């Protein structure tokens, strides 16, 4: 599972998921999976989608993960009264804005890449679309 090796602070404020995305172009591979909606991906979801893609391409080609879960999400235990401080870190998420390229792929045909990204998209909570590298 992806998570930072070390952080400056253990816990962060909830914040808001606004603004525009960086990393909107396919830069490493030939094909990409781009987010259309806004949301957050957990480390488990990122890994599940990666595994689905890897199996679909039968370990051919190369896959790049363009998102990293760097925000800790805390939860309080069940049946605990409010107050008494912030809960413990339970999992890590990556905040996703529309236009962000989530995964990239190279070394496979377009139809295999489309199939693999469709399987990966089914594992993700944000709407996505298939994109190809634009050559200038």
From Swiss-Prot:
One GO term describing the cellular component: cytosolic large ribosomal subunit
Pfam families, alphabetized: Ribosomal_L16
SUPFAM superfamilies found in the cross-reference section: Ribosomal protein L16p/L10e (SSF54686)
Gene3D superfamilies per UniProt: Ribosomal protein L10e/L16
PROSITE patterns xref list: RIBOSOMAL_L16_1, RIBOSOMAL_L16_2
Keyword entries, A-Z: Ribonucleoprotein, Ribosomal protein, RNA-binding, rRNA-binding, tRNA-binding
GO BP, one annotated term: translation
Gene Ontology molecular function terms on file: rRNA binding; structural constituent of ribosome; tRNA binding
Role of this protein: Binds 23S rRNA and is also seen to make contacts with the A and possibly P site tRNAs.
Subunit structure, interactors included: Part of the 50S ribosomal subunit.
Protein family per UniProt: Belongs to the universal ribosomal protein uL16 family.
Stored HAMAP family: Ribosomal_uL16
Protein name: Large ribosomal subunit protein uL16
Naturally occurring in which organism (per UniProt): Aggregatibacter actinomycetemcomitans (Actinobacillus actinomycetemcomitans)
Taxonomic path: Bacteria, Pseudomonadati, Pseudomonadota, Gammaproteobacteria, Pasteurellales
């Amino acid at each position: 599972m992806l998570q930072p090796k070390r952080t400056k602070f253990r816990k962060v404020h909830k914040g808001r998921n606004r603004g525009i995305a960086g990393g909107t172009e396919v830069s490493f591979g030939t094909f990409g999976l781009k987010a259309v909606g806004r949301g957050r991906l957990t480390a488990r979801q990122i890994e599940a989608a990666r595994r689905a893609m890897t199996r679909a391409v039968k370990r051919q080609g190369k896959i790049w993960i363009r998102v990293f879960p760097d925000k800790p999400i805390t939860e309080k235990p069940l049946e605990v009264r409010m107050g008494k401080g912030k809960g413990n870190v339970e999992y890590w998420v990556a905040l996703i804005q529309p236009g962000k390229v989530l995964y990239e792929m190279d070394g496979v045909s377009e139809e295999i890449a489309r199939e693999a990204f469709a399987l990966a998209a089914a594992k993700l909570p944000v709407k996505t679309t298939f994109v190809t590298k634009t050559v200038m």
